Amino acid sequence: MKNNVQLLMPREKMLKFGISALTDVELLALFLRTGTRGKDVLTLAKEMLENFGSLYGLLTSEYEQFSGVHGIGVAKFAQLKGIAELARRYYNVRMREESPLLSPEMTREFLQSQLTGEEREIFMVIFLDSQHRVITHSRLFSGTLNHVEVHPREIIREAIKINASALILAHNHPSGCAEPSKADKLITERIIKSCQFMDLRVLDHIVIGRGEYVSFAERGWI
């Protein structure tokens, strides 16, 4: 009963001021709904964020890390993984249905939702039309912990198939550091040169790390 009373506070705050007015602790408490024995839901939410450092650290953690926190079991872990997956699917649908002229921020958020937490390097391409509206996106290549083999010819073939005019390249670094390697720069140059022959523009190559990213366009490399 105490947990339910405590939970009314963030709910009432949300109804009065909007969901964005909630703190990270209050927002997490809404999803958790109940606390544990001797610990109300707000206290539990606060302790979880302190243990994992942030919402990002919490939602990208693995069950082994959860099992070391008192009062957090498989049910809470499943709830939080469900939240993370819901966010990922939301961005997926948003990209398909809104398909506006992409802002750098929206592109980055979408790619982070798709690639963060992957244990292997994944190379993605967002395909756009002549107005830079999204046609589709695809995970074209999958590799190992620190390498992914990328074939420009396959990228061009896919672009021609769907009549794309521009591309945004992206891949993740499971190590967490988003700084591009020499190999990343070389393959980007190869893709750009190959695309030029087919009148395809490469707008950016974004590398996703753990809580950070690097944009080739922002660095002036494209």
UniProtKB/Swiss-Prot annotation:
This is UPF0758 protein YicR. One of its GO terms (molecular function) is metallopeptidase activity. Keywords: Hydrolase, Metal-binding, Metalloprotease, Protease, Zinc. The lineage of its organism: Bacteria, Pseudomonadati, Pseudomonadota, Gammaproteobacteria, Enterobacterales. It comes from Escherichia coli O81 (strain ED1a). It comes from the Bacteria. The keyword Manganese does not apply. Disulfide bonds: none annotated. Zn(2+) binds at H171, H173, D184. Residues 100-222 form the MPN domain. One of its GO terms (biological process) is proteolysis. A motif (JAMM motif) lies at residues 171-184. Belongs to the UPF0758 family. YicR subfamily.
